[in-house]
């Protein structure tokens, strides 16, 4: 039997995932602050602002801008808000979400200033026990999922039964979720790969080819794995869908906002100029400095994140970034 599911945030990924949930037979309520988006989904089953490629969203999707109305009957609440605004947005829902509801994060990022993962931010904001929090991450480019191309993802929750409930609620003929209890690993994968995607995109935009991209991706994977394991993650997670899988998708597609943002930097645009031409948030941009700070906190070197931080804050070029990344000393891989 279908569930009542609320999605907080009607951006491209939130809307595409809402469609997955509706296709799986659930009753889906989208919550958004923008009245134009609310009216578009509610009255016309169309999100012309964030997901115009889908001409008609399912009939069992609706929308509201009222927080209490959005979540009052929810069995599952999905959070698809820009990571750096999650805490501010979620405190407005504290006390409104039913006690039995599972809260699921689609967000990927490390909070600036606190260096906290999204599971920590969500649980603190809503005063939520660990067994009622789940995260979803994987090679999930929103436009391809909106077009119903076959895809898989990973659902993580410390309570495997609740992870399974969430997975069952988003299983369709084209969308296959797997389950794990490694919340930390899933969160770290989703956050840190965005920094790698920025760097790969920058290299591509600057005209470098496959060798350079592969070099950055593999060193990025090593960096995010070391950081994740230091934070308490299972190393196996980094070699599955949420790790290598997401890295491949994000670092190799113009559909990735992080890759595209990096490519624009590589072509010579400033951070401000690249931001202006982006449709939506490239989460890797605010996450980069937080990753460097987290590495310092955990005593784990983060050379790629550090060099990308220099790109974003000092405006160094792609060639300078790559030179700084590898240095001149011979080291073990």
From Swiss-Prot:
Which positions bind sn-glycerol 3-phosphate? 108, 138, 193, 246, 256-258
Can the keyword tRNA-binding be found in this entry's annotation?
no
InterPro entries listed in its UniProt record? 6-PGluconate_DH-like_C_sf (IPR008927), 6PGD_dom2 (IPR013328), G3P_DH_NAD-dep (IPR006168), G3P_DH_NAD-dep_C (IPR006109), G3P_DH_NAD-dep_N (IPR011128), NAD(P)-bd_dom_sf (IPR036291)
Its GO biological process terms? carbohydrate metabolic process; glycerol-3-phosphate biosynthetic process; glycerol-3-phosphate catabolic process; glycerophospholipid metabolic process; phospholipid biosynthetic process
Pathway recorded for this protein: Membrane lipid metabolism; glycerophospholipid metabolism
The protein's superkingdom reads Bacteria
Q: Which reaction does it catalyse?
A: sn-glycerol 3-phosphate + NAD(+) = dihydroxyacetone phosphate + NADH + H(+); sn-glycerol 3-phosphate + NADP(+) = dihydroxyacetone phosphate + NADPH + H(+)
The answer, when asked if Transmembrane is one of the entry's keywords, is no
Entry EC no(s): 1.1.1.94
Protein name per its UniProtKB record: Glycerol-3-phosphate dehydrogenase [NAD(P)+]
Which parts of the sequence bind NADPH? Answer: 13, 33, 108, 142, 257, 281, 283
Q: What is stated as this protein's family in its record?
A: Belongs to the NAD-dependent glycerol-3-phosphate dehydrogenase family.
Q: Name one GO molecular function term.
A: glycerol-3-phosphate dehydrogenase [NAD(P)+] activity
Q: Which GO terms describe its cellular component?
A: cytosol
Please give one Pfam family short name.
NAD_Gly3P_dh_C
Q: Where in the cell is it found?
A: Cytoplasm
**Top EC class, one word:** oxidoreductase
List, from the UniProt record, the residues annotated as the active site of this protein.
193
Q: Keywords in UniProt for this one?
A: Cytoplasm, Lipid biosynthesis, Lipid metabolism, NAD, NADP, Nucleotide-binding, Oxidoreductase, Phospholipid biosynthesis, Phospholipid metabolism
Q: Which gene encodes it?
A: gpsA
The protein's role, per its UniProt record: Catalyzes the reduction of the glycolytic intermediate dihydroxyacetone phosphate (DHAP) to sn-glycerol 3-phosphate (G3P), the key precursor for phospholipid synthesis.
């Amino acid at each position: 039997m279908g569930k009542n599911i609320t999605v907080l945030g009607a951006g491209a990924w939130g809307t595409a995932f809402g469609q997955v949930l509706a296709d799986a037979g659930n009753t889906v309520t989208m919550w958004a602050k923008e009245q134009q988006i609310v009216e578009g989904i509610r009255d016309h089953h169309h999100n012309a602002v964030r997901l115009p490629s889908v001409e008609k969203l399912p009939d069992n999707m609706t929308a509201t801008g009222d927080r209490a109305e959005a979540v009052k009957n929810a069995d599952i609440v999905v959070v698809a808000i820009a990571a750096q605004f999650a805490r501010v947005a979620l405190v407005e829902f504290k006390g409104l979400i039913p006690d039995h509801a599972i809260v699921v994060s689609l967000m990927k990022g490390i909070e600036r200033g606190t260096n906290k993962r999204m599971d920590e931010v969500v649980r603190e904001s809503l005063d939520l026990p660990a067994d009622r929090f789940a995260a979803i991450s994987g090679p999930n480019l929103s436009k391809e999922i909106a077009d119903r191309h076959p895809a898989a993802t990973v659902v993580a929750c410390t309570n495997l039964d609740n992870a399974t409930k969430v997975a069952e609620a988003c299983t369709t003929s084209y969308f296959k979720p797997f389950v794990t209890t490694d919340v930390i690993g899933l969160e770290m994968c989703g956050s840190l790969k965005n920094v790698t995607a920025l760097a790969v995109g920058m290299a591509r935009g600057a005209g470098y080819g496959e060798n350079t991209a592969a070099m950055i991706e593999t060193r990025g994977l090593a960096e995010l794995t070391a950081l994740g394991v230091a934070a308490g993650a299972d190393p196996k997670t980094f070699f599955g869908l949420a790790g290598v899988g997401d890295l491949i998708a994000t670092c190799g597609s113009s559909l990735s906002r992080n890759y595209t943002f990096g490519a624009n930097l590589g072509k010579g645009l400033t951070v401000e100029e690249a931001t202006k031409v982006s449709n939506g948030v490239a989460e890797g941009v605010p996450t980069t400095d937080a990753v460097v700070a987290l590495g310092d906190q955990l005593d784990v070197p983060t050379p790629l994140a550090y060099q990308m931080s220099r790109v974003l804050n000092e405006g160094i070029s792609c060639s300078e970034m790559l030179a700084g990344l590898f240095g001149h000393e011979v080291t073990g891989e």
